[in-house]
Amino acid sequence: MMSRTPDARARDTQTKQIQENITSVEKHFGDLCQLFAAYVRKTARLRDKADLLVKEINVYADTETPNLKCGLKNFADQLAKVQDYRQAEVERLEVKVIEPLKAYGNIVKTKREDLKQTQSARNREAKQMQQLERMRQRNPSDRQIISQAESELQRATMDATRTTRQLEETIDDFEKQKIRDIKKVLGEFVTVEMAFHAKALEIYTTAYQHIQNVDEEGDLEVFRNSLHPPDYQSRLEIVRANSKLSLNRTGTSMSKSGTMQSRTSSRQRKRDDEEDEEEDDEDEDDLEEVTDDEH
């Protein structure tokens, strides 16, 4: 059997290398596509969780004192804005990163078809070469059959050469496009992420300021007042006033009692004096009567 020519062996090596290259791109671009898709799904889930966080902060804010409530509401508004930009991040990554990588599934499929056509042409060439060799061995003197086989081999060789050249061109274009695409995809990824994080940093800064500007002393005053409502203060003042009035009345009563006792004592002393005077007058009258009797 006629051995394959050096040119055929070189083409076989070339075909194997092209096939390995296509397989490598198919595998790694497929893996990148899956991982970027998972990244985007995680980002979308983070957005959903943040939306729940915004909702809970708003619910909590409604139970708080005025200044803290305002700070929490403003904080939640800023956090919600971040999620709007996160949603835009998700959508841009899907369009600018995932879709181009996903497209390589069809691109690789097309290149495999091109490789298959080239391989078929080379197989036909190899088959014609083997057929010619058999004819030369079986009918070395039959120039017509040998000439016909040589013509068929020549056409097969030309076809194999043409498809090989086309494959080289298309694979060259594929390689250039692959490099450009992966550069663009990763560049777009970084650009989208930088745009999101730059805006998120700006919004988070505002959110931080809102929560730090909460008037703690003002809210503490409100809280303390809530422990002692106005009606409680009024009742406390009434109790204090009543207590003071009671003390005043007690003092007045004691003062009046002392005065009355003093007056009673004075009147008693006056009555006693009057009685003494009457007794003295009676003694004087008795003395005068005795004197008159003696005369």
From Swiss-Prot:
SUPFAM superfamilies tied to this protein? BAR/IMD domain-like
Q: Which domain of life is it from?
A: Eukaryota
Keywords (alphabetical) are: Cell projection, Cilium, Cilium biogenesis/degradation, Coiled coil, Cytoplasm, Cytoskeleton, Differentiation, Flagellum, Membrane, Mitochondrion, Mitochondrion inner membrane, Nucleus, Spermatogenesis, Transit peptide
Membrane disposition: Peripheral membrane protein
Query: Spans of biased composition, class Acidic residues?
Result: 273-295
The answer to whether the entry has keyword Oxidoreductase is: no
GO BP field? cilium assembly; inner mitochondrial membrane organization; positive regulation of smoothened signaling pathway; spermatogenesis
Q: Where is the transit peptide?
A: 1-49
Please give the Pfam families that the UniProt record associates with this protein.
Answer: FAM92
According to the record, the residues making up region (Disordered) are 243-295
Query: What are the coiled-coil residue ranges?
Result: 111-185
One GO cellular component term, please give it.
centriole
Q: Where in the cell is it found?
A: Cytoplasm; Cytoplasm, Cytoskeleton, Microtubule organizing center, Centrosome, Centriole; Cell projection, Cilium; Nucleus
Q: Where is this region: BAR-like?
A: 12-222
Transit peptide as UniProt keyword: yes
Q: Locate the compositionally biased regions of type Polar residues.
A: 243-265
Q: Which Gene3D superfamilies match?
A: Arfaptin homology (AH) domain/BAR domain (1.20.1270.60)
What is the recorded function of this protein according to its Swiss-Prot or TrEMBL entry? Plays a critical role in regulating mitochondrial ultrastructure and function by maintaining the integrity of mitochondrial morphology, particularly the organization of cristae. Plays a crucial role in ciliogenesis. Plays a key role in the correct positioning of the annulus, a septin-based ring structure in the sperm flagellum, serving both as a physical barrier and a membrane diffusion barrier that separates the midpiece (MP) from the principal piece (PP).
Q: Please give the record's comment on domains.
A: The BAR-like domain displays limited similarity to other BAR domains.
Q: Which family does it belong to?
A: Belongs to the CIBAR family.
State the name under which the record lists this protein. Answer: CBY1-interacting BAR domain-containing protein 1
Q: Which organism is it from?
A: Danio rerio
